[in-house]
Protein backbone atom coordinates (compact mmCIF):
# COMPACT_ATOMS: atom_id res chain seq x y z
CA UNK A 1 0.00 0.00 0.00
CA UNK A 2 1.47 3.35 -1.02
CA UNK A 3 1.80 6.35 1.25
CA UNK A 4 2.22 9.94 0.16
CA UNK A 5 3.17 13.01 2.21
CA UNK A 6 1.45 16.31 2.83
CA UNK A 7 3.03 19.50 1.57
CA UNK A 8 4.22 20.24 5.10
CA UNK A 9 5.84 16.85 5.80
CA UNK A 10 7.52 16.95 2.39
CA UNK A 11 9.01 20.37 3.16
CA UNK A 12 10.19 19.27 6.61
CA UNK A 13 11.78 16.11 5.18
CA UNK A 14 13.64 18.29 2.65
CA UNK A 15 15.00 20.45 5.48
CA UNK A 16 12.81 23.50 4.87
CA UNK A 17 11.37 25.57 7.68
CA UNK A 18 7.58 25.45 7.81
CA UNK A 19 5.83 28.60 9.01
CA UNK A 20 3.62 28.34 12.11
CA UNK A 21 0.56 29.19 10.00
CA UNK A 22 1.14 25.91 8.13
CA UNK A 23 2.17 23.60 10.98
CA UNK A 24 2.00 23.86 14.75
CA UNK A 25 0.82 27.46 15.00
CA UNK A 26 -1.53 28.79 17.66
CA UNK A 27 -5.21 28.94 16.87
CA UNK A 28 -6.74 32.29 17.76
CA UNK A 29 -10.32 33.54 17.73
CA UNK A 30 -11.72 36.45 15.74
CA UNK A 31 -14.91 37.90 17.23
CA UNK A 32 -17.09 40.79 16.08
CA UNK A 33 -20.52 41.90 17.26
CA UNK A 34 -22.64 44.38 15.33
CA UNK A 35 -26.02 45.83 16.27
CA UNK A 36 -27.64 47.82 13.48
CA UNK A 37 -29.21 51.13 14.38
CA UNK A 38 -32.79 52.27 13.98
CA UNK A 39 -32.53 52.44 10.18
CA UNK A 40 -31.69 49.78 7.61
CA UNK A 41 -28.33 49.32 5.91
CA UNK A 42 -28.62 49.55 2.14
CA UNK A 43 -27.46 46.98 -0.37
CA UNK A 44 -23.67 47.35 -0.91
CA UNK A 45 -23.15 49.07 2.48
CA UNK A 46 -20.25 47.58 4.43
CA UNK A 47 -19.64 46.76 8.09
CA UNK A 48 -16.03 46.93 9.31
CA UNK A 49 -15.68 43.97 11.68
CA UNK A 50 -12.04 43.95 12.79
CA UNK A 51 -8.49 43.08 11.80
CA UNK A 52 -6.42 39.98 11.16
CA UNK A 53 -2.63 40.16 11.55
CA UNK A 54 -0.04 39.54 8.86
CA UNK A 55 0.75 35.85 8.49
CA UNK A 56 -2.65 34.59 9.70
CA UNK A 57 -4.07 31.49 8.01
CA UNK A 58 -7.85 31.91 7.86
CA UNK A 59 -9.51 28.69 9.07
CA UNK A 60 -12.71 27.24 7.67
CA UNK A 61 -14.79 27.36 10.88
CA UNK A 62 -16.29 30.87 10.67
CA UNK A 63 -19.95 31.36 11.63
CA UNK A 64 -22.49 34.15 11.88
CA UNK A 65 -25.24 34.20 14.50
CA UNK A 66 -28.03 36.68 13.78
CA UNK A 67 -31.39 37.98 14.91
CA UNK A 68 -34.34 38.11 12.51
CA UNK A 69 -33.75 40.23 9.43
CA UNK A 70 -35.40 41.18 6.17
CA UNK A 71 -36.47 38.60 3.60
CA UNK A 72 -33.74 37.76 1.07
CA UNK A 73 -30.97 39.63 2.94
CA UNK A 74 -27.53 38.10 2.48
CA UNK A 75 -23.99 39.13 3.36
CA UNK A 76 -20.54 38.57 1.93
CA UNK A 77 -17.55 38.52 4.29
CA UNK A 78 -14.21 39.49 2.82
CA UNK A 79 -10.97 41.28 3.60
CA UNK A 80 -9.10 44.36 2.44
CA UNK A 81 -5.71 45.95 3.06
CA UNK A 82 -5.52 47.80 6.37
CA UNK A 83 -2.83 50.09 4.95
CA UNK A 84 -4.53 51.11 1.70
CA UNK A 85 -8.17 50.03 1.98
CA UNK A 86 -7.80 48.10 -1.28
CA UNK A 87 -10.13 45.11 -1.46
CA UNK A 88 -8.19 41.83 -1.55
CA UNK A 89 -11.23 39.52 -1.77
CA UNK A 90 -14.77 40.88 -1.36
CA UNK A 91 -16.18 37.44 -0.54
CA UNK A 92 -13.02 35.58 0.48
CA UNK A 93 -14.52 34.16 3.68
CA UNK A 94 -18.21 33.91 2.74
CA UNK A 95 -20.47 34.67 -0.20
CA UNK A 96 -24.20 35.37 -0.17
CA UNK A 97 -24.93 33.92 3.28
CA UNK A 98 -28.59 34.42 4.26
CA UNK A 99 -29.22 36.41 7.46
CA UNK A 100 -33.01 36.40 7.33
CA UNK A 101 -34.70 34.14 9.90
CA UNK A 102 -32.93 34.26 13.28
CA UNK A 103 -30.29 31.57 13.54
CA UNK A 104 -26.71 30.67 12.74
CA UNK A 105 -24.95 29.94 9.44
CA UNK A 106 -21.50 28.87 8.35
CA UNK A 107 -19.21 31.45 6.77
CA UNK A 108 -16.96 29.09 4.86
CA UNK A 109 -18.02 29.24 1.22
CA UNK A 110 -15.86 32.21 0.23
CA UNK A 111 -13.64 32.27 -2.83
CA UNK A 112 -10.42 32.12 -0.76
CA UNK A 113 -11.52 29.09 1.29
CA UNK A 114 -13.27 26.69 -1.10
CA UNK A 115 -12.14 24.34 -3.86
CA UNK A 116 -9.02 23.25 -1.98
CA UNK A 117 -7.83 26.80 -1.37
CA UNK A 118 -6.54 28.38 1.81
CA UNK A 119 -5.45 31.92 2.52
CA UNK A 120 -2.60 33.34 4.60
CA UNK A 121 -2.63 37.11 4.99
CA UNK A 122 0.42 38.85 3.53
CA UNK A 123 -0.32 42.06 5.44
CA UNK A 124 -2.65 43.26 8.18
CA UNK A 125 -6.18 43.01 6.77
CA UNK A 126 -9.57 44.39 7.72
CA UNK A 127 -12.40 41.87 7.79
CA UNK A 128 -15.68 43.36 6.61
CA UNK A 129 -19.19 42.33 5.62
CA UNK A 130 -21.09 43.64 2.61
CA UNK A 131 -24.89 43.74 2.55
CA UNK A 132 -26.24 41.93 -0.54
CA UNK A 133 -29.62 41.13 -2.14
CA UNK A 134 -31.81 43.08 0.36
CA UNK A 135 -31.35 45.68 3.09
CA UNK A 136 -30.09 44.70 6.56
CA UNK A 137 -32.98 45.18 8.98
CA UNK A 138 -33.12 47.97 11.53
CA UNK A 139 -31.98 46.74 14.97
CA UNK A 140 -30.66 43.47 13.54
CA UNK A 141 -27.74 41.93 15.41
CA UNK A 142 -24.87 39.97 13.85
CA UNK A 143 -22.17 38.09 15.74
CA UNK A 144 -19.32 36.80 13.60
CA UNK A 145 -16.60 34.53 14.89
CA UNK A 146 -13.95 32.32 13.40
CA UNK A 147 -10.42 31.22 13.94
CA UNK A 148 -7.08 31.83 12.34
CA UNK A 149 -3.69 30.27 12.92
CA UNK A 150 -0.55 32.25 13.58
CA UNK A 151 2.76 32.03 15.47
Predicted regions and their residues:
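Surface-exposed, low-hydrophobicity beta-strand/loop segments enriched in small/polar/acidic residues
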Residues: 2-151
